[in-house]
Swiss-Prot record:
GO cellular component, as recorded: plasma membrane
Protein known as: Probable potassium transport system protein Kup 3
Family: Belongs to the HAK/KUP transporter (TC 2.A.72) family.
InterPro entries: K+_transporter, K_trans_C, K_trans_N, Kup
Keywords: Cell inner membrane, Cell membrane, Ion transport, Membrane, Potassium, Potassium transport, Symport, Transmembrane, Transmembrane helix, Transport
Record-annotated membrane-spanning stretches: 10-30, 51-71, 107-127, 141-161, 173-193, 216-236, 251-271, 293-313, 341-361, 371-391, 401-421, 423-443
Record flagged with keyword Cell inner membrane: yes
Reaction equation(s) it catalyzes: K(+)(in) + H(+)(in) = K(+)(out) + H(+)(out)
Membrane topology: Multi-pass membrane protein
Main location: membrane
Record bears the keyword Protease: no
Length: 626
């Protein structure tokens, strides 16, 4: 009985994974082969040897980078089931010495990898939807003037829809992608039957001969070949939603065969009719099937874009929890799925950037020049973080870890260098976008550290303060006061201000701090730690993981089990509200101080972020010179 239930659950999760995980890599056939042989930058001449060489590169890239590296190796490095660059970074930092150069380097690498993800996430919806809609031009040139408007309308509609969540339509994503992969597999298989010679490309000798025989052109071609593996990192990033097995089963049993059949089918078509390089994906289909194929491709690319958008929301939430990003408004779009969230600020930022991209580049071929460098950069960083995990957590020797990762590093480095020559043609965009995000992340983290040091410099130790207060005869007023503070060992500034103004304290005083651990979730049984400092002074530490949704009222309800009863209607929350003043000659560059101050002013309120009832909050201001 249990085995049947497990099989049913596995099948359900595998179907769901098809609709989320494989949208990006699954829509790559729309433009990958076309870009290699018909792209605007360094197109490869269509000859039998070149076609077999490129198909061989596609085949072995999917086998080595996606199947061996991600499915077999990187997926083992999961943080309690969670994957993705942030989860990998936190995992790599385990057993490290806090503040050491190694830890700082791992953080910088992880943050830069996350920043590159945003650069990649901007391009994916643009190139995917644009390449799907470009199929209309194959049907009739009369559609050409409408390709950009249709693309923009589709993308704008997708982003406007985000605030409603995907709960209502998410169930359709899996079945649609099942149909998509079945269709592209059948189209490819039909072309292979006409020209089965392309199957010889499975032999890696063809890839080797292509690279050695074409030297510089072969190197440039790698910049387009990499398009077939973009989206491969999603297999690892989405582990937390579906688990490793459903993702692995879907890849090996369905997605990989469908992709290979389609790529080899496009190669067979090019050998039979080199003029089909105009758009080999759509020309695989019979004329009567091209309109439905454009419609199906558009839906598939919207699903692919949705996965990237959801990924951006998720990674931002993790960055907020870990203190790398200011608090932003987070809306939950599903009562059942905790992971379905909507961040308005990220949503509109991405939409504006994507609209600018589509208008500026104008075609999927032009956008392909911008695509790839962010993906390969993230893949390289993933290798380095995985080495740290292997050494620190799996107890591998550094030599064994380096040796195991070396083939993947060499391949990813080759792809990265091939894409770096396209920086002037558009590759600058994801790099510039990623660098801007990286500066924001690191500036916020460093600024928070400086602010903490300034506040701590003037603070008193909480335990000695409690002893002094006990014998001071300070008046007491009814109720409970909760003072939020980043450091539970120090007296909150808000408490000192309150005491200065009111000359009294509440009957029950709680000093509360929130601590985020480098694990995805903290169970409720470990949510709160309560320490009684005296009869009416308590210290509470609320503990969350980087994917938990902070909820202070819910945490307070758990305090009762730890012996601290708090009546919500008799409770007031006291929060500090600092006004920051930048200072020349500080530990941080002045321009970064100005940036941090601007971010600090525009950060979301702690009241909303921690779900504290606004009518129970008192904010006490102070000035802090950085």
């Amino acid at each position: 009985m249990h085995k049947e239930q497990d099989k049913k659950r596995l099948a359900t999760l595998t179907l769901a994974a098809l609709g989320v995980v494989y949208g990006d890599i699954g829509t790559s056939p729309l433009y990958s082969i076309k870009e290699v042989f018909g792209g605007a930058h360094h197109p490869v001449p269509i000859t039998p040897d070149n076609v077999l060489g490129i198909l061989s590169l596609f085949f072995w890239s999917l086998i080595i980078v996606v199947t061996l590296k991600y499915v077999s190796f990187i997926m083992r490095a999961n943080n309690r089931g969670e994957g993705g660059i942030i989860a990998l970074m936190t995992l790599a930092m385990h057993k490290g010495v806090a503040g050491s150069w190694q830890q700082k380097m791992l953080v910088l690498l992880g943050l830069f990898g996350a920043a590159l993800f945003y650069g990649d996430g901007i391009i994916t919806p643009a190139i995917s939807v644009l390449s799907a809609v470009e199929g209309l031009e194959i049907l009739t040139p009369a559609f050409k003037p409408y390709i950009l408007p249709i693309t923009l309308i589709t993308l704008i509609g997708l982003f406007i829809f985000q605030r409603r969540g995907t709960a209502s339509v998410g169930a359709l994503f899996g079945p649609v992608m099942v149909i998509w992969f079945a269709v592209i597999a059948v189209l490819g298989a039909a072309a292979i039957v006409e020209n089965p010679a392309v199957l010889a490309a499975v032999n890696p000798v063809h890839a080797f001969h292509f690279l050695t025989g074409n030297s510089l052109l072969g190197f440039f071609a790698l910049g387009a070949v990499v398009l077939c593996i973009t989206g491969g990192e999603a297999l690892y990033a989405d582990m937390g939603h579906f688990g490793a097995k459903p993702i692995q089963y879907a890849w090996l049993g369905y997605v990989l065969p469908a992709l290979l059949l389609n790529y080899f089918g496009q190669g067979a078509l090019l050998l039979a009719d080199p003029s089909s390089v105009e758009n080999p994906f759509y020309l695989l289909a019979p004329e009567w099937g091209r309109y439905p194929l454009v419609a199906l491709a558009t839906v598939a690319t919207v699903i692919a874009s949705q996965a990237v958008i959801s990924g951006a929301f998720s990674i931002t939430q993790q960055a907020i929890q870990l203190g790398y990003t200011p608090r932003l408004e987070i809306q939950h779009t599903s009562d059942e799925e905790i992971g379905q969230i909507y961040l308005p600020a990220i949503n509109w930022m991405m939409l504006i950037a994507i609209i600018a991209l589509v208008i500026e580049f104008g075609s999927s071929s032009n956008l392909a020049a911008a695509y790839g460098i962010a993906v390969t950069g993230t893949m390289l960083i993933t290798n380095i973080l995985a080495i740290a995990v292997a050494v620190r957590l799996w107890n591998w020797s550094p030599a064994r870890a380096m040796l195991g990762a070396l083939p993947f590093i060499c391949i990813d480095l080759g792809f990265f260098l091939a894409n770096s020559v396209k920086i002037a043609d558009g590759g600058w965009f994801p790099l510039a976008f990623g660098l801007a995000v990286f500066i924001l992340l690191t500036t916020w983290k460093r600024g928070r550290e400086l602010l903490g040091l300034r506040l701590a410099a003037d603070a008193m130790q909480l335990k000695s303060f409690v002893v002094d207060i006990a014998g001071s005869g300070i008046g007491r007023v009814p109720g409970t006061a909760i003072f939020m503070t980043p450091d539970p060992e120090l007296v909150p500034h808000a408490m000192l201000h309150s005491l200065k103004h009111y000359k009294a304290l509440h009957e029950q005083v709680v000093v509360m701090s929130v601590k985020v651990f480098d694990v995805p979730y903290v169970p409720d049984v470990d949510r709160v730690e309560v320490h009684r400092l005296s009869n009416n002074f308590s210290q509470v530490v609320v503990q969350y993981g980087f994917k938990d949704d902070p909820d202070i009222p819910a945490a307070l309800a758990l305090c009762g089990e730890a012996g601290l009863a708090i009546e919500p209607m008799d409770t007031s929350f006291f929060l500090g509200r600092e006004t920051l003043i930048p200072k020349l000659g500080s530990e941080m560059a002045y321009w970064r101080e100005l940036l941090f101050v601007a971010m600090f002013r525009n950060a979301g309120s702690a009241t909303a972020f921690f779900k504290i009832p606004s009518n129970r909050v008192v904010e006490l201001g102070s000035q802090v010179v950085l």
